[in-house]
Amino acid sequence: LALCSILTCLVFVLMSSCVSHGSAGLDPTAEDKLLKAPVAPGYSFAFSTPRSQWQAGTMPHIYQIDPAWSELPYAGGTIRQNACGPTCLTMVYIYKTGHTDMTPVDMCALSEAGNYAPTGATEWSFMTSGAWQLGLNGTELHIDRSSITQALRSGAPIIASVRPGTFTNVGHYIVLWGIDGADQVGVYDPNSQSRSARRWGVVEVLNEIEAMWAYY
C-alpha cells in the first residue's frame, strides 16, 4: 500500500511538472504571430522592410538590430554592435539602384574586405571609397543648413556621422531622406525604430552631425 502511494505521488508530480513547463512557452502558431507583430518603440530589435518591397526611389527601413543578421560577426563584434555604417549604406544602395543583392551582411563583408573597420568602428572613407565600389557617388557636404536642405530637396539621400548626443552615446551613422516645407526631415536610424518613426527639424539634426555625404 505504501509503495502504491509513493508511485501515485510520483506520477502526480511528473504530470504537474509537464503542465507547468508547457504553459510557460509558446506553441509554434503563437510564436509565429508574435514574431510578425509590430515592434514597439524602445525594443532592442526591429524588423527591416522585406526584401520583396525594396525598389529604387523608395527608402527602406533596414535595421542592424534585425534578428535576421544582428548577431552575425562584424569588426570584432556583431552587426548589432558595430554595423550602423554598412547598414546605412545598404539603405542608400537599395534606394539608388533598386537591387536586392546587398544586405547588411554583404555590406559588412565589403567593409571588412577593404579594411574599413580595423578598430570596430566603420571609417568615414567607407562612405565614399566603399560606396564607389558599388557604383555610388558619395559627396561630402559642408555641415550647414543650406547644404543639407539643398541635397534633400534635390532628392539625394544623406548618410550622416553623428556625435554622442541624441542618437548615440558613442558615435553613429544615420540616413537622412526627404524634407517637407517646414524643414522637417526623415531620419532612418539603423539602430532605432522609434527614432525612425518621427520627423526631425533640420537644425535639431544638424547639431548632432560630425560629417555627412550626399548620394546624387
Task: Please tell me what each predicted stretch does.
Residues L1-Y116, P164:
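Active-site-adjacent structural segments surrounding the nucleophilic cysteine of cysteine proteases
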Residues V19-T29, I94, H99-Y216:
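Conserved active-site-adjacent core of cysteine acyl-enzyme catalytic domains
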